[in-house]
């Protein structure tokens, strides 16, 4: 049996295959969000109306990458986003900037940041800890909980989970 769900508040409502019936709390949140922001009630509407990007701290390739990802999100082309940059070009900073934008303005609740080596997980965590937001200069980690995925799991309040591909695979396989 297939179950489909249509969120009538989406900018282009359409039936989507779902694997679980939404919980009453989830449906209540959808209604609250629509009432609180009728012009941008869903994350799909929010990513189509993101505020202008503060380009001052960014390099041209980073600006192009962020604009490209946001264009893909707005067009709902989730399988067509790839950031490819040279070593040292600021991929992690670009991803942290994008993470901040979609958490603050895009209606995203959580982000999984995958790396292929443990030392990259540590570097990524440091990049999130050092990132200063463009609007008020606060550190990313003052606003959002960022943590590396461990054997113990994550707190429910974690907004950005950093993990190696191997750890995620192990968690899926065991869980």
Please tell me what each predicted stretch does:
Residues 1-110, 119, 123-135, 156-160, ...:
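ATP-dependent helicase/translocase motor core
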Residues 9, 137, 148-151:
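Long, compositionally biased, helix-prone stretches
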Residues 113-115:
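Short beta-strand-centered segment that lines the nucleotide-binding/catalytic pocket of NTP-utilizing
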Residues 120, 141-150, 168:
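Short acidic loop-to-helix transition motifs that present clustered carboxylates
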Residues 145-161:
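Conserved motor-coupling elements within RecA-like helicase/translocase cores
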Residues 170-172:
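Short, solvent-exposed loop/turn elements at domain surfaces
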């Amino acid at each position: 049996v297939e179950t489909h769900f249509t969120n009538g508040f989406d900018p282009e409502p359409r039936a989507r295959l779902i694997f679980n019936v939404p919980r009453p709390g989830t449906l209540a949140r959808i209604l609250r969000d629509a009432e609180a922001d009728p012009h941008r009630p869903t994350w799909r509407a929010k990513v189509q109306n993101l505020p202008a990007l503060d380009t001052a701290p960014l390099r041209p390739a980073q600006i192009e990458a962020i604009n490209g990802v946001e264009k893909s999100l707005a067009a709902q082309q989730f399988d067509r986003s790839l950031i490819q940059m040279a070593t040292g070009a600021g991929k992690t900073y670009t991803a942290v900037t994008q993470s901040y934008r979609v958490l603050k303005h895009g209606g995203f609740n959580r982000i999984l940041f995958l790396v292929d080596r443990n030392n990259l997980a540590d570097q990524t965590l440091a990049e999130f800890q050092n990132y200063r937001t463009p609007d008020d200069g606060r550190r990313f980690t003052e606003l959002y909980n960022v943590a590396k995925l461990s054997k113990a799991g994550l707190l429910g309040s974690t907004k950005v989970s950093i993990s190696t591909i191997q750890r995620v695979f192990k968690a899926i396989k065991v869980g």
